[in-house]
Structures are given as structure tokens and as C-alpha cells.
């Protein structure tokens, strides 16, 4: 008969199919069962709307009977916490070494996945700080790191000049006088440095850059000016969202992200700084950082022709090795180099 032929065709087709794995079959059956229970819940709700059922007892009975079927069974791949694995990870924590001796004595270095927040008042030397770390002697670029600098405050060429100063150890005037010397010092590190002026961009664009160019070091100057998108009730919530996004980029694309920030007016002329001085933020930004460095300088002394070159780097958060305190160094503003 036609019905018999139909069954024969169906069974022949089933015979050809590849059987589902045990886990997949279990999941499919579980989903179907949950749908059946959902239909029963909907029927009870419909009866209550129509006044046919005024008690929750039937619904409570369903929940007690089938609750375990809606709690998924997990298959988690737990972290390897053997001593060999832990010590190997510790060895990778400082892949890129700091080139400021006073900092290096306290913090070995950084690695992919780290979010480093750097804060300072205007005219303290934020841009020179990352230029010195990357392009200065024994900096990240010298160590072979692929470095990308995204700047949305200063013009890209001006930021590039700081990198030229730091790499060559020469002022603008000295470079003009001895261009060949500057070029020979700058060329080896410039191959590992890319700078992009990017006003008006958001964190989604930053993530696209990280995905496309795979940097080892990614500098956001200024981090707070890259919008994270969305609507926020308070400015500090928006800044927290930016920091969270930056941290996700660091972890997802295995790069060290330097997140440059302004400090509030409270930090003006101060040498000892703390997390609460981050402009516009409460604790949201600080909570995301692996390392937070706040750069202070003493107020200008009346009658002095030039401000002091001394800079005070406050290590106010440090998940890398736990050391907190202040290290001192000098900034040569002509060569954009931090040193001792």
C-alpha cells in the first residue's frame, strides 16, 4: 500500500542518516521536553486569565517536578593550576620590559592582556611618557614589539615628533642640524611603530584596529575620548564602560593596552596622587586596571625661569607584582625621554 511504501522510504532515509552523538541527542531531547513543559505553563496561564483556575498550586507543582530539568549541566574546562603551569604564566607576565630604571626596579614589565592606565595633569608629559617607553633606548619597539598609537587629542605629526625625539635623543633643533644622525637612530624603531590621528572614533573602531593589525602594544591617547557607545545616566558610567571595553580588547587580542587619562584639578601641583584623582571617574576605571600609573610634578616655584624636570610616578594599583609606592625620574622635554 501507499502507506507501507511511505514508511519504507522513511526508514530507508533514517538508515542513511549519521546518528547524533550522545551529548547532542540529550540536548535536543532536553530542549523538546522544556518546550512541552512550557506549553503546560502557558495552558495554566491561559486558564487563569479566563478564570478557570484561580490557584497557583498546579504551577507550583510543575516547578517542583521539573525544576532540575531546566538547570543546565555544565562541562567546564578548569584552569590548570599545577605549579609548572603557574610558574610558566608568571614568566610571561613581563614580556615587555620598562626602560625607565627607577620603574624597572619595582615592576619588571608588562605583557599581552594587561590594561595599563596612565594619568596626569595637562603639560606633565603623558605623550612623552609613552613615546619614551616605546621609542626610547631599550624601549618596547627596540624589544621587537609591534606598537600602535591611536591619538585623538594632539595631531598625529606632533605625536610622531615626540617619538622621533625619544628615538634619536635629539631636540628639534639638533635633528635639523644633523638629520642623518637622527635618521639612523629613528629608522630601526620606526618599523615597529604606527601612529594614527583618529578624532571622533569609538571603541568599536579601536577593536577593529586591534583585530586587523594585531599590536603587542596599543596606546589610546586619550582613552576617555573613545566612546564606548550606549546611553549612560552619569559620566563616570560612560568612562567605566570605556575602560571595560579597553580591557576586553587587551584580553581578546593579547595586547598590552595603555589607556591615557587626564587627572582632575585636585592633582594640580601635587606629587603624591591617588585613584580618586582620575578625571570624571569614581572607581569604575580603577577597577579594570592591571597597572595604574599616575604622574605628578611639583608646582612651579615663583622666580624660577624653568619648571623642575622631576616627575613622580605613583604606582597606585598593581596586580602584576603587588608593589605600590612612588618612583622618581626626570623628563627631558626636548628629547621626550624619561630617565634617572
Label each residue range with its predicted role.
Residues 71-169:
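The Walker A/P-loop phosphate-binding site
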Amino acid at each position: 500500500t501507499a502507506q507501507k511504501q511511505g514508511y519504507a522510504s522513511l526508514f530507508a532515509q533514517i538508515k542513511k542518516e549519521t546518528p547524533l552523538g550522545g551529548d547532542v541527542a540529550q540536548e535536543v531531547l532536553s530542549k523538546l521536553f522544556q518546550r512541552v513543559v512550557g506549553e503546560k505553563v502557558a495552558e495554566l496561564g491561559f486558564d487563569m486569565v479566563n478564570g478557570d483556575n484561580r490557584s497557583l498550586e498546579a504551577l507550583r507543582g510543575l516547578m517542583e517536578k521539573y525544576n532540575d530539568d531546566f538547570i543546565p549541566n555544565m562541562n567546564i574546562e578548569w584552569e590548570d593550576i599545577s605549579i609548572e603551569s603557574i610558574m610558566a604564566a608568571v614568566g610571561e607576565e613581563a614580556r615587555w620590559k620598562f626602560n625607565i630604571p627607577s620603574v624597572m626596579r619595582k615592576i619588571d614589565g608588562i605583557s599581552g592582556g594587561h590594561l595599563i592606565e596612565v594619568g596626569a595633569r595637562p603639560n606633565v608629559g603623558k605623550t612623552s611618557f609613552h613615546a619614551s617607553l616605546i621609542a626610547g633606548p631599550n624601549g618596547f619597539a627596540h624589544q621587537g614589539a609591534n606598537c600602535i598609537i591611536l591619538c585623538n587629542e594632539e595631531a598625529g605629526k606632533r605625536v610622531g615628533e615626540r617619538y622621533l625625539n625619544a628615538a634619536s635623543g635629539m631636540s628639534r633643533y639638533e635633528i635639523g642640524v644633523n638629520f642623518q644622525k637622527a635618521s639612523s637612530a629613528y629608522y630601526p624603531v620606526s618599523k615597529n611603530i604606527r601612529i594614527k590621528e583618529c578624532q571622533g572614533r569609538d571603541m568599536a573602531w579601536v577593536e577593529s584596529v586591534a583585530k586587523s593589525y594585531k599590536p603587542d602594544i596599543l596606546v589610546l591617547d586619550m582613552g576617555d575620548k573613545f566612546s564606548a557607545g550606549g546611553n549612560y545616566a552619569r559620566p563616570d558610567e560612560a568612562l567605566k564602560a570605556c575602560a571595560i571595553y579597553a580591557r576586553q580588547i587587551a584580553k581578546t587580542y593579547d595586547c598590552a593596552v595603555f589607556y591615557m587619562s587626564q587627572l582632575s584639578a585636585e592633582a594640580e601641583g601635587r606629587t603624591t596622587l591617588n585613584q580618586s584623582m582620575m578625571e570624571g571617574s569614581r572607581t569604575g576605571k580603577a577597577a579594570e586596571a592591571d597597572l595604574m600609573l599616575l604622574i605628578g610634578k611639583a608646582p612651579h616655584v615663583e622666580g624660577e625661569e624653568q619648571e623642575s624636570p622631576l616627575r613622580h610616578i605613583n604606582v597606585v594599583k598593581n596586580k602584576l607584582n603587588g608593589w605600590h609606592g612612588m618612583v622618581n625620574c626626570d623628563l627631558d622635554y626636548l628629547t621626550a625621554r624619561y630617565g634617572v
